[in-house]
């Protein structure tokens, strides 16, 4: 019989599941044999008749291999660990077993040495086996050890002779060579060595295996060449499915795994899902029919295109690196050639770039990797259905000018349901995993109906059969929604739990504002930004809903971008147009932001060098000539902007030439030569581009497919341009309006969504000034080694301006010369930042840093004569200015903030010294107490004449302290000198030392607060938070109270000669905390030059009701907020554009472990914030449960709502539940909000008077934790437990002195970890919460003063000295170095001799006695390797005696 007729099933078809329980004796009724220690799979020994308590499934058979226990893969584990997993699991046990035979017998060595195609079940199982082996064994190698490697932890380094002996003795499960060195995987010992006793419990049920904490397969071991055995031909009937997208990937044997593993040198751990051992019959048949039986029978794989590379994620998934464009992609570029349209695919196959996901919660959905979105409907069935419905041919490439979509006349709006014209109908829909099964449109304006846009096939609405497209939604559960915003209605639908029903009253008779059946409506300019776009046709299909629709569904109520009448743009004068053409018609409210104003036109001459791949930009036809469509190589096209009109090329006028002729001219330019371009920028904006794009420039900054330096490709190919870059030598690209680049839509519209959060309406897309007193300029900076060389201030409250802080000498901004301290930042790479949070802007800058450059737009106040204000005697240089229509009221507010200094402003230093009354305050303390005040330093400030020149002030005075008793010191007093020594220009750390060395008394020379402030702004309490006293936003938001008559209002004061007053920065406390974030790439992320990281994940279940595309980080839980806890529309500001938008409600049931539930909480009514999960203990029930994450909001505790709940009540509820707790959680962003962020039920400007104040070290260049990074290991001393060992009191009740640290604050906050003390004395202390933590280790390569990364906590010097009997680290001695991060902010310091904190409580308790604590450090300052924890809740005695370098959580500085 020929091979082609052989149809033997794969061994996975024989896998069966048995569900059993423990019998009355508590036994399972069978014995286990084998195990990795014997080089075998675990398999069933004797199955005792009548002793196995079967619940369902098949019977257990002796000698069968055991693959999984309750979905935990156990192949590769020792018998000890398998038994531990079984012991940990509750009844019933679900065992997956398979009969031995063929390629799977009990011999692990045999199976591991077989070759399988990547992506196959066997290949995945091999990787899982290796992962499990490395929990208990360490690979050995004959190569010399490298710097930073720990012998016995990373590798066992042996001689070649020893290696050969091991191999001969059969002690190695795998062996091979890599780069002429031998590598092997020894059998693990039956009983683990002391080194590996403490491995993580990631193998336990419910855990999520990840790279964190779990031993990884070393790259060298995975890549070693071995004498692999071919599997029997009848068994190998699978071909791999890379990423599960139904696309066949050409085989590559496992020994040729790519040598790139991102930035790390190790291959990652097992993929999240275990292998799927059973497959649908039709899939099996398809495999049988179409796939060869042996890998070598397949045709040779096509080579990857030039400069492409294959790599693997930490979960073992394949991705591809394009070194040409420095981007990564999930899609194999070789397969794009074989791609076919979805309508031509069979029903059981998927188009190129699609992946099918079977989710246990959300059911089956599909991932579109090309457009980075998800949907429930099968794309093939959808495409065929659309083809039948619309019978729409593919549109050929063309250069025709854009046509505007044919929007209909807007119907007369009414809020009175009785005045609606049409047929009323009511229906009841039950919410399913797909939501209600329809999408809505409208509600973007107050006078706009909300209408049904589409009914999703097979959804609840479609099954009900009553709802139709265009139906106006009138009532939702007796609530009239006429006049409600889109976001309001979305939240109403989201608030309905799955499984519950909603009553709808609809009115039929109103057409949609556009015709969804009209093919013309698919013609959306790729870069025109619509408020309500019609469906977009991509690759000839209508089935792609853009992110723009997602915006209209999920964002807050988005104001119209123009306050003009809908058609007013037609009558605008065309003075600014040099070519005499008119802008295209704009219909209704769908005004592109680019078309709502004009800039001053200008001609610019640029010189661009043509490279081997072309010029690095594409052009497209437009009514006025050839415009730059896309910048593919930003660095190669300096000064060029998308939308620029090309006037001349090498002195040849091309304005009247056709697209093809201009392309030919560009082609004829020799490679390597300079080409001179004259471009026209400004005037009326192009119909489809903007010279200063709002969102479009962003796609060049990070999207895998947009930052191409690629030549053009035909747009009708069903694959993204990035994949075939090398195939097309042309450097231009025809512009087809029917086929916008999906990544452009994705990136642009995401940026729109985020830019519209809490931004008031404006008429111009540029933040032009409302008068002649401000000038805008664009600044392009390239990142240097030290970053962009400037600091960012502001953004503490929504609406507060973002300002340029200090410009670092000799940095990029300083050398450029155009950026000045005090400039207001308006755009970052085309993204508007007005009204955004400080963190949002910092993240934009981090993103730009990874791309190596940034385009900034700033506003600067202009003095007489229209010249920009000189700063520091430096001319601003020649800049182009733009003028457009005045903005709305928000512009007035923003500008007025800068019209005059606020009443709280500090005067210049000279004025302070001559005009203000200074006084000396002497504070005496006792031996056992501190001075009782906190100093805040604000050195990094703009250097203009109106800024803070006395940078150190009193930030807090502790009740009952010497500072409080002397009654001469007040919060806000500026400190000029300490003990007669001027501290104005002194670093904070030196001030700390100065006060620490002062002994029992200190003399402070101060400028009293009364001298700095007008009486109207005097604090209501001397010890009140400066944020509450001083911030104008805290007193009265100008947005809420714009009256110029208010004494505090900057509007009421005359304009000073200073160029710009930094409103809100002298006054706003939080900006002082965050102002010292220098604009550098985030050191916790790969540097911008390392582009080989895996692509961003976006494969997320479609969001509930509306099939929303997923967030950038698409492997997070779902996007939609299914059960909004409260209709309250006030939300936290969007602080990070990269944060996963996965606001998903879910329930977690947990049983208490030996040390409690294993999590801690933050927040409560007293802090004006909701309750959040603060941290998870490594070995606690919460982390084993696998669902709870740091930053999740707690909505209910044991069925009781947490709204307005105090911290103490939450603890009480958790304790009252006994051994179990049930929590309703709302998926968070991975960050715990700070206490001064506006809570959903508190005013954004509300102050927290009783909360502690903190400053920051001047050297602190770190941004707060980003959700893209894992939270640090949790602090077990704060887990919830009733026992005395676990402090479950309110984490930050500053009203309870007994719970305060010496500086009046709790010790812990999110991201700060403390070493679990090995000292029995310290562990036994009841006040464990105040026990000292490990000193933060400096990160490798950073100076100690900058090394205070989030995640490291300070030690209480006095407690450390008393409790541990050892000397406390000197950096902590005598001072409490505090940082305000919210309730529970912990002191933090830099390292030995550091003092990198910005707040000081002058506590001198153990100061003179403390000295540095000696201890080993990892080589090179690298972080210590974190050992794993044994699977299960067991703990082996003596594990605490491990070397500190191996202890989890131990920091270098404390060792």
Swiss-Prot record:
Start and end residues of each stretch annotated as Disordered: 205-306, 869-913, 1011-1136, 1231-1455
Residues of the Guanylate kinase-like domain: 109-283
Biased composition (Polar residues): 1011-1040
Tissue: Specifically expressed in brain.
GO CC annotation terms, alphabetical: bicellular tight junction; cell-cell junction; centriole; centrosome; ciliary base; cytoplasm; dendrite; late endosome
Location within or outside the cell: Cytoplasm; Late endosome; Synapse, Synaptosome; Cell membrane
Region (Interaction with DDN) residue spans: 302-381
Record-annotated PDZ domain positions: 17-101, 426-510, 605-683, 778-860, 920-1010, 1147-1229
Basic and acidic residues bias locations: 281-296, 1067-1083, 1287-1299
Cited CDD domains: PDZ0_MAGI-1_3-like, PDZ1_MAGI-1_3-like, PDZ2_MAGI-1_3-like, PDZ3_MAGI-1_3-like, PDZ4_MAGI-1_3-like, PDZ5_MAGI-1_3-like, WW
Subunit text: Interacts (via its WW domains) with DRPLA. Interacts (via its second PDZ domain) with PTEN (via unphosphorylated C-terminus); this interaction diminishes the degradation rate of PTEN. Interacts (via guanylate kinase domain) with DLGAP1. Interacts (via the PDZ domains) with GRIN2A, GRID2 and NLGN1. Interacts with CTNND2, CTNNB1, MAGUIN-1, ACVR2A, SMAD2 and SMAD3. Part of a complex consisting of MAGI2/ARIP1, ACVR2A, ACVR1B and SMAD3. May interact with HTR2A. Interacts with IGSF9, RAPGEF2 and HTR4. Identified in a complex with ACTN4, CASK, IQGAP1, NPHS1, SPTAN1 and SPTBN1.
Biological function: Seems to act as a scaffold molecule at synaptic junctions by assembling neurotransmitter receptors and cell adhesion proteins. Plays a role in nerve growth factor (NGF)-induced recruitment of RAPGEF2 to late endosomes and neurite outgrowth. May play a role in regulating activin-mediated signaling in neuronal cells. Enhances the ability of PTEN to suppress AKT1 activation. Plays a role in receptor-mediated clathrin-dependent endocytosis which is required for ciliogenesis.
Record-stated family: Belongs to the MAGUK family.
Protein name: Membrane-associated guanylate kinase, WW and PDZ domain-containing protein 2
Record organism: Homo sapiens
Gene name as annotated: MAGI2
């Amino acid at each position: 019989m020929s091979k082609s007729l052989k149809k033997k099933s794969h061994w996975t078809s024989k896998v069966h599941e048995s569900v059993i329980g423990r019998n009355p004796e508590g036994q399972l009724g069978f014995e286990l044999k084998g195990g990795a220690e014997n080089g075998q799979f675990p398999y069933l020994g004797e199955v005792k008749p009548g002793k196995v308590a079967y619940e369902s499934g098949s019977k257990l058979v002796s000698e069968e291999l055991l693959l999984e226990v309750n979905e935990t893969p156990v192949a590769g584990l020792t018998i000890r660990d398998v038994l531990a997993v079984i012991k940990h699991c509750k009844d019933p046990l679900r065992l997956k077993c398979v009969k031995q035979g063929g390629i799977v017998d009990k011999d692990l060595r045999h199976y591991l040495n077989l070759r399988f195609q990547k992506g196959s079940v066997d290949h995945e199982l091999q990787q899982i086996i290796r992962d499990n082996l490395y929990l208990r064994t360490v690979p050995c190698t004959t190569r010399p050890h490298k710097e930073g490697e720990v012998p016995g932890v990373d590798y066992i380094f042996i001689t070649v002779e020893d290696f050969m002996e091991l191999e001969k003795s059969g002690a190695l499960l795998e062996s091979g060579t890599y780069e002429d060195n031998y590598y092997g995987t020894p059998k693990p010992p039956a009983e683990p060595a002391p080194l590996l006793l403490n491995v993580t419990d990631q193998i336990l049920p419910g855990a999520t295996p990840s790279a964190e904490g779990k031993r990884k397969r070393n790259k060298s071991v995975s890549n070693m060449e071995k004498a692999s055995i071919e599997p029997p031909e009848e068994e190998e009937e699978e071909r791999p499915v890379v990423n599960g997208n139904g696309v066949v990937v050409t085989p590559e044997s496992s020994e040729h795994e790519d040598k790139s593993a991102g930035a790390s040198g190790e291959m990652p751990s097992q993929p999240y899902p275990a292998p799927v051992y059973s497959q649908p019959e039709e899939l099996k048949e398809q495999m049988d029919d179409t796939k060869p039986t042996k890998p070598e029978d397949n045709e040779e794989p096509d080579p990857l295109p030039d400069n492409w590379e294959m790599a693997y994620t930490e979960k073992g998934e394949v991705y591809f690196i394009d070194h040409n464009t420095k981007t990564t992609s999930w899609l194999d570029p070789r397969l794009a050639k074989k791609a076919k349209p979805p309508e031509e695919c069979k029903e059981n196959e998927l188009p190129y770039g699609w992946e099918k996901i079977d989710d246990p919660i959300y059911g089956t959905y599909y991932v579109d990797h090309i457009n980075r979105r998800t949907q429930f409907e099968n794309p093939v069935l959808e495409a065929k259905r659309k083809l039948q419905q619309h019978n729409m041919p593919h549109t050929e490439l063309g250069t025709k000018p854009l046509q505007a979509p044919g929007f209909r006349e807007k119907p007369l709006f009414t809020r009175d349901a009785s005045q609606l014209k049409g047929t009323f109908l009511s229906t009841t829909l039950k919410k399913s995993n797909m939501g209600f099964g329809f999408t809505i449109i409208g509600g973007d304006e107050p006078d706009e109906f909300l209408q049904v846009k589409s009914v999703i096939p097979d959804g609840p609405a479609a099954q009900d059969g009553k709802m139709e497209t265009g139906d106006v939604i009138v009532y939702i559960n007796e609530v009239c929604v006429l006049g409600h915003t889109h976001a309001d209605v979305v939240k109403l639908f989201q608030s309905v739990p799955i499984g519950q029903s909603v009553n709808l009253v609809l009115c039929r008779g109103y057409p949609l504002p556009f015709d969804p059946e009209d093919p013309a409506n698919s013609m959306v300019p790729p870069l025109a930004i619509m408020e309500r776009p019609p469906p977009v046709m991509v690759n000839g299909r209508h089935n792609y809903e853009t992110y723009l629709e997602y915006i209209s569904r999920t964002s807050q109520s988005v104001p119209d971008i123009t306050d003009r009448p809908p058609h007013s743009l037609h009558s605008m004068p065309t003075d600014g147009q040099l070519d005499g053409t008119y802008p295209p018609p704009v219909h209704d409210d769908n005004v592109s932001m680019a078309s709502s104003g004009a800039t001053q036109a200008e001609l610019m001459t640029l010189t661009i060098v043509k490279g081997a791949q072309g010029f690095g930009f594409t052009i497209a036809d437009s009514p006025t000539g050839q415009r730059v469509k896309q910048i593919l190589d930003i660095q190669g096209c300096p000064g060029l902007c998308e939308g620029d009109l090309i006037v001349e090329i090498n002195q040849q006028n091309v304005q009247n030439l056709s697209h093809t002729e201009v392309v030919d001219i560009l082609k004829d330019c020799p490679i390597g030569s300079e080409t001179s371009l004259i471009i026209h920028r400004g005037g009326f904006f192009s119909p489809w581009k903007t010279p200063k794009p709002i969102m479009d420039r962003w796609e060049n900054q990070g999207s895998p497919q947009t930052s191409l330096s690629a030549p053009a490709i035909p747009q009708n190919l069903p694959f993204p341009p990035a994949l075939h870059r090398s195939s097309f030598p042309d450097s231009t690209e025809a512009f087809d309006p029917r086929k916008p680049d999906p990544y452009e839509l994705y990136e642009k519209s995401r940026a729109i969504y985020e830019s519209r959060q809490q931004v008031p309406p404006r008429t111009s897309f540029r933040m032009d000034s409302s008068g002649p007193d401000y000038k805008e300029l664009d600044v392009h900076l390239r990142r240097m080694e030290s970053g962009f060389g400037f600091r960012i201030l502001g953004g503490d409250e929504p609406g507060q301006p973002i300002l340029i802080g200090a410009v670092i000498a000799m940095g990029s901004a300083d050398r450029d010369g155009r950026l000045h301290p005090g400039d207001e930042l308006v755009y970052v790479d085309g993204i508007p930042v007005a009204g955004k949070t400080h963190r949002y802007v910092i993240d934009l800058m981090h993103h730009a840093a990874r791309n190596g450059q940034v385009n900034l737009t700033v506003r600067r106040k202009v003095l007489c004569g229209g010249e920009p204000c000189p700063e520091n005697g430096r001319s601003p240089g020649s800049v182009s200015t733009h003028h457009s229509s005045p903005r709305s009221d928000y512009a007035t507010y923003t500008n007025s903030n800068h019209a005059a200094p606020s009443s709280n402003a500090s005067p210049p230093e000279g004025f302070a010294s001559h005009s203000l009354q200074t006084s000396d305050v002497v504070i005496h303390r006792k031996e056992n107490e501190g001075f009782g005040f906190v100093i805040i330093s604000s050195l990094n400030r703009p250097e203009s004449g109106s800024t803070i020149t006395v940078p150190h002030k009193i930030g807090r005075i502790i009740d009952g302290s010497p500072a409080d008793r002397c009654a001469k010191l007040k919060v806000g007093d500026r400190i000029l000198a300490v003990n007669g020594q001027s501290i104005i220009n002194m670093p904070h750390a030196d001030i700390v030392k100065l006060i620490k060395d002062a002994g029992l008394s200190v003399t402070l020379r101060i400028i009293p607060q009364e001298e700095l402030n007008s009486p109207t702004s005097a604090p209501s309490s001397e010890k009140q938070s400066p944020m509450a006293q001083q911030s104008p936003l805290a007193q009265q938001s100008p947005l809420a109270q714009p009256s110029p008559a208010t004494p505090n209002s900057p509007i009421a004061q005359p304009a000073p000669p200073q160029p710009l007053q930094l409103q809100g920065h002298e006054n706003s406390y939080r900006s002082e905390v965050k102002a010292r974030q220098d604009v550098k790439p985030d050191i916790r992320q790969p540097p911008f030059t390392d582009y080989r990281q895996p692509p961003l994940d976006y494969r997320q279940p479609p969001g509930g009701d509306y099939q929303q595309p997923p967030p950038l980080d698409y492997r997070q839980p779902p996007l939609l907020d299914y059960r909004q806890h409260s209709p309250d529309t006030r939300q936290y500001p969007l602080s990070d554009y990269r944060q996963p938008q996965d606001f998903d409600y879910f329930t977690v049931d947990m049983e208490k472990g030996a040390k409690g539930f294993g999590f801690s909480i933050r927040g409560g009514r007293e802090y004006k914030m909701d309750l959040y999960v603060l941290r998870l203990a490594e070995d606690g029930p919460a982390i084993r449960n696998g669902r709870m994450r740091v930053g999740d909001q707690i909505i209910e505790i044991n069925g009781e709502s947490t709204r307005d709940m105090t911290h103490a009540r939450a603890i009480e509820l958790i304790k009252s539940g006994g051994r179990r707790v049930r929590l309703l959680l709302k998926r968070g962003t991975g960050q715990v909000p700070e206490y001064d962020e506006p809570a959903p039920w508190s005013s954004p400007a509300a102050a927290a008077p009783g909360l502690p104040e903190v400053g920051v070290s001047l050297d602190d260049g770190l941004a707060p934790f980003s959700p893209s990074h894992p939270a640090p290991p949790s602090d077990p001393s704060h887990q919830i437990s009733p026992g005395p060992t676990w402090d479950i009191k309110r984490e930050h009740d500053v009203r309870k002195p007994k719970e305060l640290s010496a500086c009046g604050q709790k010790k812990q906050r999110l991201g700060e970890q403390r070493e679990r003390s090995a000292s029995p004395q310290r562990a036994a202390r009841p006040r464990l919460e105040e026990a000292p933590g490990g000193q933060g280790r400096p990160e490798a390569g950073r100076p100690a003063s900058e090394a205070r990364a989030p995640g490291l906590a300070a030690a209480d010097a006095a407690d450390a000295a008393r409790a541990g009997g050892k000397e406390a680290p000197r950096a902590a001695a005598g001072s409490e170095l505090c940082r305000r991060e919210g309730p529970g902010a912990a002191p933090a310091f830099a390292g030995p001799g550091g003092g990198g904190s910005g707040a000081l409580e002058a506590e001198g308790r153990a100061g003179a006695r403390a000295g540095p604590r000696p201890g080993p450090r990892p080589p090179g300052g690298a972080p210590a390797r974190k050992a794993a924890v044994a699977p299960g809740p067991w703990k082996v005695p003596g594990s605490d005696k491990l070397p500190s370098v191996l202890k989890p959580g131990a920091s270098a500085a404390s060792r």
